[in-house]
Amino acid sequence: MQNLQEKASEWSGVETNHAFAIDDTNLFQKLGLQTFINLSTNFYNRVYVDDEEWFRSIFAKSDKDKAIQNQYEFLVQRMGGPPLYSQRRGHPALIARHRPFPVTHEAAERWLLHMQQALDNISDIDHDSKIMLMNFFRHTAYFLVAGVEQKNQSLHPCKDADGRHPCKNF
């Protein structure tokens, strides 16, 4: 059985060492707080007006300003800055926090589309940093897909991929 990092690498096409190249550079020091606020704001401005209703509905019960704050605080912390997210919300626990949402391959790709567009729209981020960030985002998106699938499977071990309950036949 593959571990979550291996699945994330396989599904995302991003090797773990490339996904975590962000740890070799303090992107918070390099880019600054305002850049992460701008990135998160730009990203969620796109998400909340997405053309696809199914994707918008994932975020419908979330306050946009809180989503922006949660994301930029997480990014600041993860990219080498102060632990803003943990101070306010506790451990990031990404899989657990995303479990209530339909974190699927399709949703991950849609999320990544908006993040790529947001990155492309922020001129304060240099090309190499954009590549590092996008590798991290792509790998992490599929890490979440794998983690949520695994958690859901452990809660419903007798459900197959189509939602049927094959164990009831015994």
Swiss-Prot record:
One Pfam family in the UniProt entry: Bac_globin
Keyword hit for Iron: yes
GO MF term list: heme binding; metal ion binding; oxygen binding; oxygen carrier activity
GO-annotated biological processes: nodulation; response to nitric oxide
Keyword field: Heme, Iron, Metal-binding, Nodulation, Oxygen transport, Transport
Residue numbers binding heme b: 98
Induction / repression: Down-regulated by nitric oxide (NO), particularly during nodulation mediated by Sinorhizobium meliloti inoculation.
InterPro entries: GlbO/GLB3-like, Globin-like_sf, Globin/Proto, Hemoglobin_trunc
Coiled coil residues, start to end: none
Role according to the record: Hemoglobin-like protein that exhibits an unusual concentration-independent binding of O(2) and CO. Required for general plant development and during nodulation. May promote shoot organogenesis from root explants.
Family: Belongs to the truncated hemoglobin family. Group II subfamily.
Oligomer status and interactors: Homodimer when ferric.
Protein name (Swiss-Prot/TrEMBL): Group 2 truncated hemoglobin 3-1
Organism: Medicago truncatula (Barrel medic)
Lineage: Eukaryota, Viridiplantae, Streptophyta, Embryophyta, Tracheophyta
Gene designation: GLB3-1
